[in-house]
């Protein structure tokens, strides 16, 4: 008698992806983040759906509707804080997932890596539009400043900004379309995640050694389902600690004031997970130059497979590259800190040095380190 999961058309797909999937026997906890990102996406879609039932995308009532959710809807405060902090959790997992991909050379799987970069852009766009919806001070001014960056594009910039706004300023039309896009994009992200998995399962997973592991594979279930479940429990414990004890830790107090176009906050800044890119944007005095640097700070990930010079894939046995990797991590943390500081000395020069260091490490130092390590290993 054949097992149903191996014959039923739908079950067979699930079986090949999550049960009988041949997996390297030595992958570590760093490979947990893919499934954790899936969990984050489910949390965001479910909590967002319930919020959308009570939210009104109108400039006059948006702020009040969020207040109504927190005060009058059963467990509305919990759903709202789960959604707000779920975004932070999503980005923590996302950045750790990307960091693992860089450290262990997973970018060698070009299709999977490129789909991952598209996913990153989609998640960032979704998060930005979601931040605008509560219609607080930082929502309004963040939307105004970030959308205004498009005016730096030569010739079509000004028209493009007005087209996105749906008028001559951020107003009801902008809020309405941002809500529509914010609602649909997570489902597009879910579809793209399936494509991401499809490409990954074409090649099989990488492993910490960065060597082929076809001769030593084990089934995904029960070994990695239990391992992923442990990661899931830890993640949920951290998540609910944040939601129930420190719900406003990662938010901005300015967003508790209703949007007022006549009163500019002293320091306009995006959510913490965009601060590193925001710091790079601000470190260049020229508007167009800043926008190009902002886009390149993410798009530079697509260059990694093309500027790889080392013969070894993983950084596990490459001490010089390891040092540069952790220097890059430290640099991103410095940029995140600078992005949250006012534009005044000494933060300006620190931001400029950190931005230059970011691009130098990725574009110059890491490829040079790869060549030196090849020479040292006589490869």
Curated annotation (Swiss-Prot):
Residues noted as binding a ubiquinone in the record, renumbered to the chain: 201
Pfam families found in the cross-reference section: Cytochrom_B_C, Cytochrome_B
Keyword terms of this UniProt record: Electron transport, Heme, Iron, Membrane, Metal-binding, Mitochondrion, Mitochondrion inner membrane, Respiratory chain, Transmembrane, Transmembrane helix, Transport, Ubiquinone
GO terms under cellular component: mitochondrial inner membrane; respiratory chain complex III
Cofactor detail note: Binds 2 heme b groups non-covalently.
Name the record gives this protein: Cytochrome b
Family designation: Belongs to the cytochrome b family.
Cofactor(s) this protein requires: heme b
Source lineage: Eukaryota, Metazoa, Chordata, Craniata, Vertebrata
Subunit structure: The cytochrome bc1 complex contains 11 subunits: 3 respiratory subunits (MT-CYB, CYC1 and UQCRFS1), 2 core proteins (UQCRC1 and UQCRC2) and 6 low-molecular weight proteins (UQCRH/QCR6, UQCRB/QCR7, UQCRQ/QCR8, UQCR10/QCR9, UQCR11/QCR10 and a cleavage product of UQCRFS1). This cytochrome bc1 complex then forms a dimer.
Membrane topology: Multi-pass membrane protein
Additional remark text: Heme 1 (or BL or b562) is low-potential and absorbs at about 562 nm, and heme 2 (or BH or b566) is high-potential and absorbs at about 566 nm.
InterPro entries from the UniProt entry: Cyt_b/b6_C (IPR005798), Cyt_b/b6_C_sf (IPR036150), Cyt_b/b6_N (IPR005797), Cytb/b6-like_sf (IPR027387), Cytochrome_b (IPR030689), Cytochrome_b_C_euk/bac (IPR048260), Cytochrome_b_N_euk/bac (IPR048259), Di-haem_cyt_TM (IPR016174)
């Amino acid at each position: 008698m054949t097992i149903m999961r191996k014959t039923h058309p739908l079950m067979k797909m699930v079986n090949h992806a999550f049960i009988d999937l041949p997996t390297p026997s030595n992958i570590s906890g760093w490979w947990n983040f893919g499934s954790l990102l899936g969990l984050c996406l489910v949390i965001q879609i479910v909590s967002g759906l319930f919020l959308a039932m009570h939210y009104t995308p109108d400039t006059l009532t948006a702020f009040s509707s969020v207040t109504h959710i927190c005060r009058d809807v059963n467990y509305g405060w919990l759903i709202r804080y789960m959604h707000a902090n779920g975004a932070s959790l999503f980005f923590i997992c996302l950045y750790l997932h990307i960091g693992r991909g860089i450290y262990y050379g997973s970018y060698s799987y070009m299709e999977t890596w490129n789909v991952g970069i598209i996913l990153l852009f989609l998640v960032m766009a979704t998060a930005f539009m979601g931040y605008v919806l509560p219609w607080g001070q930082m929502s309004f001014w963040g939307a105004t400043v970030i959308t205004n960056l498009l005016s730096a594009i030569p010739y079509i910039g000004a028209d493009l900004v007005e087209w996105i706004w749906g008028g001559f300023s951020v107003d009801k039309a902008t809020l309405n379309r941002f809500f529509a896009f914010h609602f649909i994009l997570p489902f597009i992200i879910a579809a793209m995640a399936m494509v991401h998995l499809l490409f990954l399962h074409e090649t099989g997973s990488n492993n910490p050694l960065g060597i082929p592991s076809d001769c030593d594979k084990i089934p995904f279930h029960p070994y990695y389902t239990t391992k992923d479940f442990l990661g899931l429990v830890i993640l949920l414990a951290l998540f609910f600690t944040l939601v129930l004890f420190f719900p406003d830790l990662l938010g901005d107090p300015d967003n508790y004031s209703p949007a007022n176009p006549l009163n500019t906050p002293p320091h306009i800044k995006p959510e913490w997970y965009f601060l590193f890119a925001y710091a790079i944007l601000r470190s260049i005095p020229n508007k167009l130059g800043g926008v190009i640097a902002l886009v390149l700070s993410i798009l530079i990930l697509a260059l990694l497979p093309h500027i790889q010079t080392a013969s070894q894939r993983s950084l596990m046995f490459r001490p010089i590259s390891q040092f540069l990797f952790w220097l890059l991590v430290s640099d991103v943390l410095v940029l995140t800190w600078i992005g949250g500081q006012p534009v005044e000395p000494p933060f300006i020069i620190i931001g400029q040095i950190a931005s230059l260091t970011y691009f130098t490490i990725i574009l110059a130092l890491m490829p040079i380190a790869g060549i030196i390590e090849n020479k040292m290993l006589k490869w």
